[in-house]
Amino acid sequence: MQLTPREKDKLLISMAAEVARKRLARGVKLNHPEAIALITDAVVEGARDGRSVADMMEAGAQVITRDQCMEGVPEMIHDVQVEATFPDGTKLVTVHNPIR
């Protein structure tokens, strides 16, 4: 299977998000990379489902809460920017203060 660098990045993020979901299910708090992966994956999948950019900006901020993260992680993540493929093309989605 030949994958482009972008496809490899998407696959890596998807796998990291899956690991984060399993850890949350076990009650383990997320670290910085896991939190970013989970938020990013939610935005990418929502875009693929046909949701709007504005909708994904809001939805991305509701993926995880402060209680689900290790201490200090929410303060480290001010913005998450994701290039997501929407039905009308690829767009940059910025989620401000994603962990509330």
Curated annotation (Swiss-Prot):
It is found in: Cytoplasm. GO terms for biological process: urea catabolic process. The keyword Cytoplasm applies. GO terms for molecular function: nickel cation binding; urease activity. It catalyses: urea + 2 H2O + H(+) = hydrogencarbonate + 2 NH4(+). Pathway: Nitrogen metabolism; urea degradation; CO(2) and NH(3) from urea (urease route): step 1/1. Its main location: cytoplasm. Keywords: Cytoplasm, Hydrolase. GO terms for cellular component: cytoplasm. Its EC number is 3.5.1.5. Heterotrimer of UreA (gamma), UreB (beta) and UreC (alpha) subunits. Three heterotrimers associate to form the active enzyme. Belongs to the urease gamma subunit family. HAMAP family: Urease_gamma. This is Urease subunit gamma. The gene is ureA.
